[in-house]
Amino acid sequence: MPTLLPRAAALTLAVLMPLLAGAQAVDLAGVKFEPQIMLGGQALQLNGAGIRYKAIFKVYAAGLYLASKASTTDAVLAAPGAKRIHVVLLRTIDANEFGKILSAGIQNNATREEFIAALPGIQRMGEASSQYKQLVAGDTLTVEWLPGTGTTLYVKGKSEVGPYKEPAFFNAMAKIWLGKSPADHLLKEALLGQAPRRQDN
């Protein structure tokens, strides 16, 4: 497919830019991800960032922030301290449909026990998504984990879900992008700070 190589190259650049640019922000399709942020009084660093594609279309840009670098899903989930997943839409999408896609992403990557543990947050996420008609380019979805506080989901900067004190909801949300059946395999590799492999199917 002719679109695969440019896409892989773009995502590889997304991974390498922090190394090449030092302390400069990573710019993906006009969305800037700062190399460091503060969350709950803790300094977090950009672990990786990339773009979610559907066919040739850019759907959203996403960045993962952790206290220290992690290159595997297990390491991300086990990492101590605060964590943030920040998503910025690059096109208009039906909010209710987006909520269903996220819920399906959780279900596709969670065990039955994990899904049940995260169910209160999943149900509230569905309720929250129904309050919005559309999400447009520039709108944000942010999932934050703060030890002692729990997981909170923000839509357009507004707290909509949580906080849930147990890590189950954050882990379930993280697996949408980092699980065995992620939303986008190349995006998963970018978030984990890995050079994306070219995909031929």
Locate the predicted segments by residue:
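Bacterial N-terminal signal peptides
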Residues: 10-19
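N-terminal secretory signal peptides that target proteins for export/translocation
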Residues: 1-5
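Flexible glycine-rich active-site/ligand-binding loops centered on an Asp-His dyad
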Residues: 162-187
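Short strand-turn-strand beta-turns centered on an Asx-Gly dipeptide
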Residues: 155-158
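Cysteine/selenocysteine-centered motifs that mediate thiol-based redox chemistry or coordinate metal-sulfur cofactors
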Residues: 185-201
